Curated annotation (Swiss-Prot):
Keyword annotations: Acetylation, Cytoplasm, Disease variant, Intellectual disability, Methyltransferase, RNA-binding, S-adenosyl-L-methionine, Transferase
InterPro entries xref list: MeTrfase_RsmB-F_NOP2_cat, MeTrfase_RsmB-F_NOP2_dom, PUA-like_sf, PUA_sf, RCMT, RsmB/NOL1/NOP2-like_CS, SAM-dependent_MTases_sf
Native organism: Homo sapiens (Human)
Keyword Signal in record: no
PANTHER family given in the database record: NOP2 YEAST -RELATED NOL1/NOP2/FMU SUN DOMAIN-CONTAINING, TRNA (CYTOSINE(72)-C(5))-METHYLTRANSFERASE NSUN6
Name of the protein: tRNA (cytosine(72)-C(5))-methyltransferase NSUN6
């Protein structure tokens, strides 16, 4: 059920996306009316959260069943005794799925209001509480302990510290203020704690702030799928070319039983430190993270470096993951994007530079997995078509497990090639209306089918590098 307006985009950005989703191949296959309907549905679904919260179990430190039991206890506490089921994914054995309850339509709105920024609002819809830096505006006499209605300023028009706001805002639910208005807007830079504890969110999801941090990693379903598609083996040398914050890096290491070598690169120092922190927290020793630009990761002088630091000699890695920087247009919920067409379209050249480096660094018969969390044709299927033409040594491969839909028409790929891709399309199923009664009556297989389809927008392609002749 759609309760929020469709994602707010600049008109030129919406037209740019529409051209991709109503390209000649799609219109020929579906008809103009159906293609347009699917595109409008997509825009509506992007502003809503997925119907499941997905967490990956760190199987390096604990069994899935043990962590599932601990998590059930945690959910009982958070949900005041409500019995929300936890499902283990049948194809991704280290993934647990928690259904989201909502939208809850009978929440009474309060006179006392707080306005949060769009990014904070998106996090609230995925189970987060409101932290003080995310609060943009609050009612004049708000005190600690007050019941507050929380709204998202989806267009970024509310002025910091305002006492009221009449612009476009979306109701996120009610919570209890942990701080007064005066404390929130005191100007103290160290004020980073919780501002509002959400007690009646429109979408009820668990909060994972400091919950079983050594055993669980919060990850969208397609993101957890990627490392399984890569299928790393113990003893191999793996490269995660754009690794921050380390979710996929640590997953790769866990799937290898921490045996082998996982090299993680990112060009921003603080992000690399986060990868190292996550590896340490999860007890993984096979990861080495470096602050380095992935486009320059190929060593040009062919002199072997005994230290094993970047840049690397060509054909150094058994498997490479390129989870590429992208426009992120598949993220959910996302009620507004202020980017220009130039910004949305700016990633394709960078992705190709990274792809070129990845192909050079991959051993013959090695596996390369390319993924993005966006929905654009230019960053997904068009990149696959370009790669297959640019690098005759690459062959597109079927993926296992195959959970997402096939690739989108429009880049000139054959039907067989499209079937070898995985595209997660947020418009694939109607938005669910989930309450405790419907959960009790739901069949497990129906819930799993919904979890596979109602996710963020995401794309995965798998290649093998042919043997040199």
């Amino acid at each position: 059920m759609s309760i929020f307006p469709k994602i707010s985009l600049r008109p030129e950005v919406e037209n740019y996306l529409k051209e991709g989703f109503m390209n000649k191949e799609i219109v020929t296959a579906l008809g103009k009316q159906e293609a347009e309907r699917k595109f409008e549905t997509l825009l509506k679904h992007l502003s809503h959260p997925p119907s499941f919260t997905t967490v990956r179990v760190n199987t390096h430190l604990a069994s899935v069943q043990h962590v599932k039991n601990l998590l059930l206890d945690e959910l009982q506490k958070q949900f005041n005794g409500l019995s929300v089921p936890i499902l283990q994914h049948p194809d991704l054995q280290d993934v647990l799925l928690i259904p989201v309850i909502g939208p809850r339509k009978n929440i009474k709105k309060q006179q006392c209001e707080a306005i949060v920024g769009a990014q904070c609002g998106n996090a609230v819809l995925r189970g987060a509480h409101v932290y003080a830096p995310g609060i943009v505006s609050a009612s004049q006499f708000m005190k600690a302990g007050d019941v507050i209605s929380v709204y998202s300023d989806i267009k970024g028009k509310c002025k910091k510290g305002a006492k009221e706001f009449d612009g476009t805002k979306v109701f996120l639910g009610n919570g209890i203020s942990e701080l007064s208005r005066k404390e929130i807007f005191s100007g103290l830079p160290e004020l980073k704690g919780m501002g509002i504890r959400m007690t009646e969110p429109v979408y009820l999801s668990p909060s994972f702030d400091s919950v079983l941090p050594r055993y669980l990693f919060l990850q969208n379903l397609p993101s957890a799928l990627v490392s399984h598609v890569l299928n790393p083996q113990p003893g191999e040398k793996i490269l995660d070319l754009c690794a921050a914050p380390g979710g996929k890096t640590t997953h790769i290491a866990a799937l290898m039983h921490d045996q082998g070598e996982v090299i993680a690169l990112d060009k921003i120092f603080n992000k690399v430190e986060k990868i190292k922190q996550n590896a340490l927290l999860l007890g993984l020793n096979s990861i080495r993270a470096f602050c380095f630009d992935g486009t320059k990761a190929v060593k040009l002088d062919m002199v072997e470096d005994t230290e094993g630091e970047p840049p690397f000699l060509p054909e150094s890695f058994d498997r490479i993951l390129l989870d590429a920087p992208c426009s992120g247009m598949g993220q959910r919920p996302n009620m507004a994007c202020t980017w220009s067409v130039k910004e949305v379209a700016s990633y394709q050249p960078l992705q190709r530079k990274l792809f070129t480096a990845a192909v050079q660094l991959l051993k013959p018969e090695g596996v390369l997995v390319y993924s993005t969390c966006t929905i654009t044709l230019a960053e997904n299927e068009e990149q696959v078509a370009w790669a297959l033409t640019k690098f005759p040594c690459l062959q597109l491969q079927p993926q296992e497990p195959q959970i997402g839909g096939e690739g989108m028409r429009g880049a000139g790929l054959s039907c067989e090639q499209l079937k070898q891709l995985q595209r997660f399309d947020p418009s694939a199923v109607p938005l669910p209306d989930t309450d405790m009664d419907s959960l009790r009556e739901a069949r497990r297989e129906d819930m799993l089918r919904l979890a596979n389809k109602d996710s963020i927008g995401f794309f995965i392609a798998k290649f093998v590098k042919c043997k040199s002749t």
